[in-house]
């Protein structure tokens, strides 16, 4: 099945600047998102009798590896991501942690990947399912990869309005950067699953049953010393900074850093992540 333009855009993004930035910031991002990882591991651990779990949009594989550690010898935890740099990092980290026998990492678009039919007891995702150009097709493909009654469990962001920390940098720098990409409602991206009715419709149309969508508010932290790396490498601002002249780049970073002052408490940056915890059955 041919990819369309949106899929090509996502592949280019996550195999380019954004993907390499995530690899470079892997440690700080994994630490910041550790609470979500724990929630997903706990949800999947009791739903995977044979230890076969698929992690969608696995990035550098932290959740995949955590599942493998929790499920123990004999488990088979598979991470899939469209980003080649992230998958390479995931494989390297699995080797480093001696988890190669329990893990596998696939560089592919989960919307179109030919997974083993009914091959998984559980399917999970930490912020990895909001980027499909055709979410119904994607979740149908994932359902075909799930065994009967297998559990789907993923975490997605609520709205940008409810997550001011996540948009602080781009909002502050926007007056200096008129060409910076603007987030579009319901488009593939971080806040693509902000609307609960949309999530429910996608799950229903793709054949999943017993959907549950719960509000999830999680306190997250980041070391203040890592804040400049975070705001200058990630998100819409991080993707355009390298295109700017030195003066404009410096002004944009200064404006963005000032916007984070309300979140800085001594040596720590704190914010509340407003998310959805979503589950369903195949």
Where are these regions (language model features)?
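Short glycine-dipeptide loop
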Residues: 50, 73-74, 146-152
């Amino acid at each position: 099945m041919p990819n369309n333009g949106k899929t090509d855009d996502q592949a280019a993004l996550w195999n380019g600047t954004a993907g390499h930035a995530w690899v470079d910031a892997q440690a700080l991002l994994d630490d910041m998102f550790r609470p979500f990882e724990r929630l997903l591991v706990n949800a999947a651990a009791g739903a995977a009798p044979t230890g076969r779990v698929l992690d969608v949009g696995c990035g550098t594989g932290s959740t995949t590896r955590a599942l493998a550690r929790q499920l123990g010898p004999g488990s088979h935890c598979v991470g899939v991501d469209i980003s080649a740099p992230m998958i390479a990092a995931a494989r390297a980290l699995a080797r480093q942690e001696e988890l190669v026998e329990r893990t596998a990492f696939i560089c592919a678009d989960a919307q179109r990947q030919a997974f083993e039919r009914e091959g998984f007891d559980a399917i999970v995702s930490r912020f990895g399912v909001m980027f499909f150009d055709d979410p119904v097709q994607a979740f149908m493909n994932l359902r075909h990869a799930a065994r009967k009654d297998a559990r789907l469990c993923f975490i997605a962001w609520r709205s940008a309005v409810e997550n001011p920390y996540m948009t602080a940098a781009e909002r502050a720098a926007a007056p200096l950067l008129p060409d910076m990409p603007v987030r579009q409602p319901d488009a593939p991206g971080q806040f693509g699953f902000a609307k609960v009715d949309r999530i429910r419709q996608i799950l229903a149309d793709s054949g999943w049953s017993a959907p549950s969508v719960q509000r999830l508010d999680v306190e997250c932290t980041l070391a203040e010393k890592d804040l400049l790396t975070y705001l200058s490498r990630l998100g819409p601002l991080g993707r355009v900074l390298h295109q700017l002249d030195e003066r404009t780049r410096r002004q944009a970073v200064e404006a963005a850093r000032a916007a984070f002052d309300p979140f800085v408490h001594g040596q720590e940056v704190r914010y509340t992540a407003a998310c959805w915890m979503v589950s369903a059955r195949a």
